[in-house]
Amino acid sequence: MKKIGIAITDPEDWTARALIKAAKEKGFSPLVFDLSDAEVRIGSGISEPASIFKAGEVLLSDLDALIVRDVGAGAFEGVSFRFDILRELEAEGVSVINSPEAIQNAANKYHASYLLAKAGLPVPETVAVQSLEAALKVISEFGDAVIKPVFGYKGKDIARVKNREIRFSDRKIEPAPVEEILEKLLEEKGMLYIQEFIENPGRDIRAFVVGGTAIGAIYRKAAAGSWVNNLSQGGSSDRCVLTDEQEKIAEKASLALGTTFAGIDIIEGTEESEENKKTEGMSSENRKSPRILEVNGTPSGKGIFDAWGINPADHILEYLKNIL
């Protein structure tokens, strides 16, 4: 029986439990552990193999495959160590999905935008800067801008800047001057990742891709009075049937970042967009064309399951069964 490791951080997480259940149903022997419990012994005193990878009682190098539900948060060196372990397990012959490179590609919003654009995929206009002067210039150019943490999740700490007012995703309009807030953010982060705000129908799309195929999608609708569509920020979900164009860019986005499974967030533009009104020579069809906001390399499958009854964990384990 093939040994499948499942790296989790929350035993009660819906997706973690779904992966464990699906692994058993596919005939695997799932070994569940937290990467924050991992330890490695290298070199002197070890005969064969040269290194020993363990997490609790799980001998990681004995695994046939490893599904990463979550790497976990923490201090820089600790998180880096976990990614090193994943890379080293790959070198030891363990099939790791998603690969550490793919997870890092998706987790870094700036680098993900670069890779998506390089692959010819549509993304909002994006500028990364390291000074207050440059940030103010970009915000003025966009008119309506969004500042996101490069390493962020669940819609937290996203700020919208419009008419010299700044509003974070979980707060009301900030009373402090924009310059003061931006300067503080620069001091904390060292750079700012700024995107044009895309006027939209009050929703975005989360498409779930497994093995290069879009298996389902949901609309995520912002809560009343909010501009952030994340479910964790109070948004709601509904069924979404992808257009051919949306399906194609979702699948290509997963490929561009190297993910085996991913949540692809897509925004639909509207013809009435202020940004689009200022864009000369752009057709109505192009004004409403979809753009990729970001890619999640460790996505939850609960939203798709609740809306459609489609269980991404079943698809992930079926994919794994076919490659082992």
UniProtKB/Swiss-Prot annotation:
Residues 113-321 form the ATP-grasp domain. It is an enzyme of class 6 (ligase). This is Tetrahydromethanopterin:alpha-L-glutamate ligase. NCBIfam families: MptN_Meth, rimK_fam. It comes from Methanosarcina mazei (strain ATCC BAA-159 / DSM 3647 / Goe1 / Go1 / JCM 11833 / OCM 88). Pathway: Cofactor biosynthesis; 5,6,7,8-tetrahydrosarcinapterin biosynthesis. Mg(2+) 1 binds at residues 265, 294. GO terms for cellular component: cytoplasm. The keyword Oxidoreductase does not apply. Mn(2+) 1 binds at residues 265, 294. Binds 2 magnesium or manganese ions per subunit. Residues 268-295 are annotated as: Disordered. Its cofactor is Mg(2+); Mn(2+). Gene3D superfamilies: 3.40.50.20, ATP-grasp fold, B domain. Belongs to the RimK family. MptN subfamily. Its EC number is 6.3.2.33.
